Amino acid sequence: MSSVIAQKDENVVWHQHAVTKTQRADLKQQKPAVLWFTGLSGAGKSTVAGALENRLAEQGFHTYLLDGDNVRHGLCSDLGFSTQDRRENIRRIGELAKLMADAGLIVLTAFISPHRAERQLVRDLLPEGEFIEVFVNTSLEVCEQRDPKGLYKKARAGEIANFTGIDSEYEVPLNPEIDLPAGEKGIEALVDLLVEQLTLRGVISPR
């Protein structure tokens, strides 16, 4: 199903809240951020993001994980997998992540998001430094070996069209904030690296 973007109504204006984004973040003792995990299917995006959320929750930080499969059960259930619908899927998630960051949360998103232009679209929604692109750098070979959903096998057999990495291009991030060697290190080591980066960037502080 294709998405339809309504024209903006000039009578619709942004309502300023009495409680500010800074106040919400201060109450949580953290800095709002959107960690955008991108990579091939099977790269480990959801696994790493979930492990990071567990670690942050254990330390008392306020987070929310947006997963590619989960949002298609509700917010994006009307969208298919055409180029237009995939773009709209990312646009909606970007807007949702922006609202969650405005609430003072550390937002983790796990989406293939194969195109640089769409990732840039989300980056442009947020203040400088708030969008943290995390490239889950796992080779196609390793992803195919894992193939947890059997999708690569189906794509190779021609049962799935326009599958990213097989017959649809994945545009590797040119300058991600974090290049995560997910094909080389274990989950705990990757989470340690991410926590270190978040601390260096001032998103979190030791507790």
From Swiss-Prot:
ATP binds at residues 39-46. Gene3D superfamilies: P-loop containing nucleotide triphosphate hydrolases (3.40.50.300). The keyword NADP does not apply. The active site is at 113 (phosphoserine intermediate). Pathway: Sulfur metabolism; hydrogen sulfide biosynthesis; sulfite from sulfate: step 2/3. One of its GO terms (biological process) is hydrogen sulfide biosynthetic process. It comes from the Bacteria. The keyword Oxidoreductase does not apply. Keywords: ATP-binding, Kinase, Nucleotide-binding, Phosphoprotein, Transferase. It is an enzyme of class 2 (transferase). One of its GO terms (molecular function) is adenylylsulfate kinase activity. Its EC number is 2.7.1.25. It holds the Pfam family APS_kinase. It catalyses: adenosine 5'-phosphosulfate + ATP = 3'-phosphoadenylyl sulfate + ADP + H(+). HAMAP family: Adenylyl_sulf_kinase. Catalyzes the synthesis of activated sulfate. Belongs to the APS kinase family. This is Adenylyl-sulfate kinase.
